[in-house]
Amino acid sequence: MKRDSSFWWVQGPGWLLFVYLIYAQAIPAFDYDIGVAMGTQESAQQITAVGVAFWYGFAFADLLIYIPFLALGLVAHWSGKMWGRVLLGAALGITVYWPVVCLAAVVAARDATGWNLENEMEYWMVLPLITLWGAWSLWRITR
């Protein structure tokens, strides 16, 4: 496999995202309140109990599916294995999808009773970049 700059633009941010997901999603999947204390999850006072359930659902699914797919896909992609492209492609599909879902939920919930998200701008600064990187990386590994 040719390790040109685009290879590194898949691998580098991919591993950064992996580390972020362990910290921000895997830990709260075991104890959501720890995620709130760490600042990686929103409290029920900010997003309601339904919002917490929604965010927890993402954390749990990330722990079971997304994080393992991303890690195994990146390792196999690094090794030049064909199945790595398939697994990484699945993880990148999730990478493109979940930020869009989260941003749509943030917009749809703006006027909902009990929804008091203090700093929506953080979502708008980070999530579109993750989506763009995921889409570009998906394109890169399939060409």
Where are the regions that the model predicts?
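Topology signature of small-to-medium multi-pass alpha-helical membrane proteins
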Residues: 1-143
